[in-house]
């Protein structure tokens, strides 16, 4: 029965990690927001690893938090373990990772959504969009309800025509046997979207009571209290460990013998899987001479005995999975609770999006998360918050917000997607960021709080605290630039103990700090400040002074990037009317439709000569424009 | 991206004119020039008024040695050709010194201008009339394609193979560092320690240095085309030498490391730097073969890039002439049949046979006839007959050297980072830069390949 269900500013389809951030951002900005999900009990569900963060991804969580998003706060309330990774390396690559209590994570997120002003939660299945003259005006659900909105965000994850595969069994399903979304996928095709088929997988889960942990190595969390959110003040100290074990030659033998039963090799799976999370059968085939592979046993929560067997992602038949478990030390008697599986799903080719995540094909329609060809909760959430912000801004008639590659990992992620596309599920890696020294875990607030505040996602109170921190950093840096440390016996002693060579003369505190063996703590001892220096201020001062040379180099590169970003290309440029462009470049430019020269130069197949030609036309203002018919 | 950096190039035609100008344009033009310029009065270019010219020297900041005596003009934006800050370094004419100045400029922060790039900038900055737009585009297109052809030609063979191998080594090292960062818990991946990284970086530096010293084109640019004049007594070797030297202001040098009795002179023939070997012997009308013996001269000839074989038009070919042809079989030879002012007694058909397709030039050095043809033959040989002097062969060579030098500098930065205890992931920034610079030489800087390498080299996954 068709009926009018209501009118909103923004409708978000899906309430996974992208959907939650999109809905919250939109509602908090002040847009009247409706979020529709297939199953209200599955809000913020983690179908794969029970963990959040890690290299690059952990920094994304901090960025989301600095922009006023929820993921960081939610995991801080619900983790069972947290660790800082890469502590032995430079500041640019440090990252937090937490093991989540999966159920608690969902419950907390649901509570947050339920209590959010301007936000309506609804269980339902969206089957069509209301599109008039290329403009999205709302959605239609399976039950016939028409909901109208000024902007719509699709965050359907792996549900679009999802199919689960275990051995030779294949059935239509979303992740974890949820109902899939088939009609919406067909509808997107009808609208003219180009879809690709991607694949991902998940390992089996076993019962903790049946694991012999004595045969594994313990992996505890950090003792030091840590949190993702800059606003978190309460830390969870009671942490649960993870455990490490390995596959054996016997495991590999079984895989070898049963490879023909794997849908990956039988040709049953056609979707492109990610190289960074291959199945165990992939690993054994590709790295055949490796005698063993690591297996991490990760508890899925405090109130459950279910344990995630990380490293054993597989789509081999269930009975083979059981055999595999028997060969792994500690898991010989482990009870299988859920079998691992592969899932195939539709994603849209992300070069069909503007950097705001609005689709080029349908105005006021945005997509975020796994539907855009990414993988990972953090990647999804990062896109979600940006799509939510832009959808709300569209609805309220405000500016578009685009993060640059030098602003945030989120900027790198979205730019890569919309500029280069992806031919496998995309995962963020630190090596994808050319300015990773600037995009640190520790300075996400310095990079993005200002923007979060301007948009209206950061509270006045938090903003004032942020400004105070910023001032304290500058004050202390300035002090260290001026204070001279003299070679007194006490000073020499401290330096000697740190393993450095003694001073010959007085030296500026900042210069002494630049010595590799010196830390801010040493400097504080030698030249104490008059005020109390908070640890997060000390951290910034130390990093900014110690690595100044490298930071400066990166900043210079960013300067150059900014100049190119400021050379804007009109949206309605007609590339066919520009003579001299190479054929491949012309095709790519027409497809991607970059907004700036900087973006254009990152498209593969567009070479420097094409960029020069483009510049010539732009400078001349003689751009032929495609008429907007 | 390269649209907004400081560019430099030799902006006068090569080998012609009494002065040669190295021009810089861009934000850092004055700053870069200041790093190299020493004025006798100690003034700095950043302090001088716009549109003024200054006397001084170009000094290599690394060695502190004077490279060239110069006049430097400083012209600040916007009243310049490109509407950017422009510095012009006026050098003495001659290939070697101006090229060294250019190399220094490039090593100190400028990028070698692409063909037509000064014009392009002038255009982009609104200096040039609208009607010239299409012409500029044609220029960009044509010159780029051509530069690419030249680059590709040069890239065939050993140099490109070496660079690709070197890049692969760096890439594997980078992937190794990256995998430690992105997958810190994979304990079966060996940790890339500073010591290990240093080993790799030193290896790469060594290879780059080797490349810099062995890349033939690079050697020619720095040292000139090793040229030997041979011929029987009294065929006119000495006159040929004088003609080349006279026309082109030879610089006499005593090169350390070569045999003491072999003296070299530099001449610049239509932009081709020739290093004439054993000029002393020739001036004493002795042939190199007579002087240092057959075996040694054979060695000498083998090392030569170019051999000028002189014959006497007035006399029949002798056994000795035939022997010289035999000694130079398969080498780059220009046959000069001299003394055409006298009646012909030589068997030209036989000469053509012996020359086997290599160029033959008829001259009368006494009457100063045929010298132009000879110079053209030399230039044709060097530029492969495709490019006129001052064009791209020289440019791309210079470009490769500049890129190699920059890559070397990046590696050195990486090494000094390791020495002062910087974390591996910061040191890696410089290593990666070296990889990108080497990639520019072979025309390959695809970012994605690092990620491909990561997954090919290591076994990762959930």
Curated annotation (Swiss-Prot), chain A:
Coiled-coil annotated residue ranges, if any: none
Residue numbers binding NAD(+): 273-287
Binding positions (FAD): 14-19, 126, 181, 370
GO biological process: tRNA methylation; tRNA wobble uridine modification
SMART domains in UniProt: GIDA_assoc_3
Protein's UniProt keywords contain Flavoprotein: yes
Major location category of this protein: cytoplasm
Function: NAD-binding protein involved in the addition of a carboxymethylaminomethyl (cmnm) group at the wobble position (U34) of certain tRNAs, forming tRNA-cmnm(5)s(2)U34.
PANTHER family: GLUCOSE INHIBITED DIVISION PROTEIN A, PROTEIN MTO1 HOMOLOG, MITOCHONDRIAL
HAMAP family associated with the record: MnmG_GidA
NCBIfam families registered for this protein in UniProt: mnmG_gidA (TIGR00136)
Annotated family: Belongs to the MnmG family.
Name of the protein this chain belongs to: tRNA uridine 5-carboxymethylaminomethyl modification enzyme MnmG
Native species: Geobacillus thermodenitrificans (strain NG80-2)
Swiss-Prot record, chain B:
GO (cellular component) term, any one: cytosol
Similarity remark: Belongs to the TRAFAC class TrmE-Era-EngA-EngB-Septin-like GTPase superfamily. TrmE GTPase family.
Name of the protein described by the UniProt record: tRNA modification GTPase MnmE
Binding site for GTP: 234-239, 253-259, 278-281
Domain TrmE-type G: 224-383
Enzyme class at the top of the EC tree: hydrolase
Gene of this entry: mnmE
Textual note on the cofactor: Binds 1 potassium ion per subunit.
Record's keyword terms, sorted: Cytoplasm, GTP-binding, Hydrolase, Magnesium, Metal-binding, Nucleotide-binding, Potassium, tRNA processing
EC numbers, comma separated: 3.6.-.-
Subcellular location: Cytoplasm
Function: Exhibits a very high intrinsic GTPase hydrolysis rate. Involved in the addition of a carboxymethylaminomethyl (cmnm) group at the wobble position (U34) of certain tRNAs, forming tRNA-cmnm(5)s(2)U34.
Necessary cofactors: K(+)
Example GO BP: tRNA methylation
CDD domains: trmE, TrmE_N
Organism field: Geobacillus thermodenitrificans (strain NG80-2)
InterPro entries reported in the protein's UniProt record: G_TrmE (IPR031168), GTP-bd (IPR006073), GTP-bd_TrmE_N (IPR018948), GTPase_MnmE (IPR004520), MnmE_dom2 (IPR027368), MnmE_helical (IPR025867), P-loop_NTPase (IPR027417), Small_GTP-bd (IPR005225)
GO MF assignments: GTP binding; GTPase activity; metal ion binding
């Amino acid at each position: 029965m068709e009926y009018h269900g209501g009118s909103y500013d923004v409708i978000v389809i899906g309430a996974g990690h992208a959907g939650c951030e999109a809905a919250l951002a939109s509602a908090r900005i002040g847009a009247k927001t409706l979020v529709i999900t297939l199953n209200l009990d599955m809000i913020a569900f983690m179908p794969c690893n029970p963990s959040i963060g890690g290299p690059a991804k952990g920094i994304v969580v901090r960025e989301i938090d600095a922009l006023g998003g929820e993921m960081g706060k939610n995991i801080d309330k619900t983790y069972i373990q947290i660790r800082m990774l890469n502590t032995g390396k430079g500041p640019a690559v440090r990252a937090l990772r937490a093991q989540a209590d999966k159920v608690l994570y969902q419950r907390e997120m649901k509570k947050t959504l339920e209590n959010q002003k301007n936000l309506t939660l609804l269980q339902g299945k969206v089957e069509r969009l209301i599109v008039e003259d290329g403009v999205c005006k709302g959605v239609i659900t399976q039950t016939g309800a028409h909901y109208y909105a000024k902007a719509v965000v699709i965050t359907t994850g792996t549900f679009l025509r999802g199919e689960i595969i275990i051995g030779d069994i294949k059935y239509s399903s979303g992740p974890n046997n949820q109902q899939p979304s088939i009609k919406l996928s067909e509808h997107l095709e009808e609208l003219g979207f180009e879809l690709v088929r991607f694949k991902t997988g998940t390992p089996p889960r076993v019962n903790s009571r049946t694991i012999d942990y004595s045969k594994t190595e313990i992996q505890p969390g950090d003792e030091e209290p840590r949190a993702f959110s800059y606003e978190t003040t309460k830390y969870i100290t009671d942490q649960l460990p993870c455990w490490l074990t390995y596959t054996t030659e016997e495991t590999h033998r079984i895989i070898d013998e049963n490879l023909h039963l794997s849908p990956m090799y039988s040709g049953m799976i056609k979707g492109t899987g990610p190289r960074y999370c291959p199945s165990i059968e992939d690993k054994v085939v590709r790295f055949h001479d490796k005698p063993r592979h690591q297996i991490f046993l990760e508890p899925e929560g405090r109130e459950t005995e279910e344990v995630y067997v990380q490293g054993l992602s597989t789509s081999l038949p269930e009975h083979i999975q059981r055999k595999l478990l028997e060969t792994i030390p500690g898991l010989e008697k482990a009870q299988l609770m859920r079998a691992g599986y592969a899932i195939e799903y539709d994603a849209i080719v992300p070069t069909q999006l503007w950097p705001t995540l609005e689709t080029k094909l349908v105005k006021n329609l945005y997509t975020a998360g796994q539907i855009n060809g990414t993988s990972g909760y953090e990647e999804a959430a990062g896109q979600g918050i940006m799509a939510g912000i832009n959808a709300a801004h569209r609805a309220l008639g405000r500016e578009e917000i685009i993060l640059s590659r030098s602003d945030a990992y989120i900027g790198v992620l979205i730019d890569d997607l919309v500029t280069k596309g992806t031919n496998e599920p995309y995962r963020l890696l630190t090596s994808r960021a050319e300015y990773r020294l600037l995009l640190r875990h520790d300075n996400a607030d310095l990079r993005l709080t200002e923007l979060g505040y301007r948009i209206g996602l950061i509270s006045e109170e938090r903003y004032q605290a942020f400004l105070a921190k910023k001032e304290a950093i500058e004050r202390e840096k300035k002090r260290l630039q001026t204070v001279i440390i003299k070679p007194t016996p006490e000073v020499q002693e401290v330096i000697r103990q740190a393993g450095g060579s003694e001073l010959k003369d007085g030296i500026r505190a900042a210069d002494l700090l630049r010595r590799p063996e010196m830390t801010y703590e040493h400097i504080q001892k030698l030249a104490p400040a008059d005020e109390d220096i908070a640890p997060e201020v000390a951290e910034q001062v130390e990093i900014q002074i110690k690595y100044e040379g490298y930071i400066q180099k990166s900043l210079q590169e960013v300067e150059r990037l900014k100049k190119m970003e400021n050379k804007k290309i009109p949206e309605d440029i007609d590339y066919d009317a520009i003579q001299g462009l190479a054929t491949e470049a012309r095709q790519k430019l027409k497809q991607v439709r970059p907004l700036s020269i900087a973006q254009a130069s990152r498209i593969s197949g567009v070479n420097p000569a094409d960029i020069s030609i483009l510049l010539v036309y732009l400078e001349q203002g003689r751009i032929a424009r495609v008429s907007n018919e | 991206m390269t649209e907004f950096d400081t560019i430099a190039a030799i902006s006068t035609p090569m080998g012609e004119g009494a002065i040669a100008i190295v021009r810089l344009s861009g934000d850092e033009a004055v700053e870069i020039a200041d790093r190299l310029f020493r004025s006798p009065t100690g003034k700095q270019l950043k302090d001088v008024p716009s549109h003024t010219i200054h006397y001084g020297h170009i000094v290599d900041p690394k060695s502190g040695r004077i490279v060239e005596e110069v006049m430097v003009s400083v012209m600040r934006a916007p009243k310049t050709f490109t509407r950017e800050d422009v510095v012009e370094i006026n050098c003495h004419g001659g290939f070697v010194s101006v090229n060294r100045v250019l190399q220094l400029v490039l090593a100190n922060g400028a990028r070698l201008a692409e063909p037509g790039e000064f014009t392009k900038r002038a255009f982009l900055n609104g200096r040039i009339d609208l009607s010239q737009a299409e012409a500029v585009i044609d220029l960009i297109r044509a010159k780029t394609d051509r530069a690419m052809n030249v680059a590709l030609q040069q890239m065939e063979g050993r140099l490109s193979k070496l660079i690709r191998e070197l890049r692969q080594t760096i890439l594997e090292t980078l992937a190794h560092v990256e995998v430690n960062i992105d997958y810190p818990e994979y304990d079966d991946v060996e940790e890339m320690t500073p010591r290990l990284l240093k080993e790799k970086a030193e290896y790469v530096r060594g290879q780059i240095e080797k490349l810099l010293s062995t890349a033939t084109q690079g050697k020619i640019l720095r040292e000139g085309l090793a040229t030997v004049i041979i011929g029987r007594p009294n065929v006119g070797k000495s006159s040929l030498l004088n003609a080349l030297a006279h026309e082109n202001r030879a610089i006499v040098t005593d090169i350390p490391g070569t045999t003491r009795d072999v003296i070299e002179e530099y001449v610049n023939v239509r932009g081709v730097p020739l290093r004439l070997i054993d000029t002393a012997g020739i001036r004493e009308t002795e042939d190199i073969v007579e002087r240092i013996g057959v075996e040694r001269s054979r060695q000498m000839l083998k090392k030569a890039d170019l051999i000028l074989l002189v014959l006497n038009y007035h006399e029949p070919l002798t056994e000795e002439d035939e022997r010289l042809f035999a000694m130079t079989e398969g080498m780059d030879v220009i046959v000069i049949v001299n003394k055409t002012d006298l009646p012909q007694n030589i068997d030209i058909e036989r000469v053509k046979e012996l020359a086997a397709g290599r160029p033959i030039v008829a001259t009368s050095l006494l009457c100063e006839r045929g010298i132009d043809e000879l110079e053209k033959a030399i230039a044709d040989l060097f530029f492969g007959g495709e490019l006129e002097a001052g064009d791209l062969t020289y440019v791309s060579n210079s470009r490769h050297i500049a890129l190699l030098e920059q890559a070397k500098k990046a590696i050195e930065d990486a090494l000094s980072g390791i020495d002062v205890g910087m974390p591996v992931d910061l040191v890696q920034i410089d290593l990666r830069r070296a990889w990108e610079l080497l990639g520019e030489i072979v025309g390959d800087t695809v970012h994605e390949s690092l990620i491909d390498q990561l997954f090919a080299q290591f076994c990762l996954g959930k």
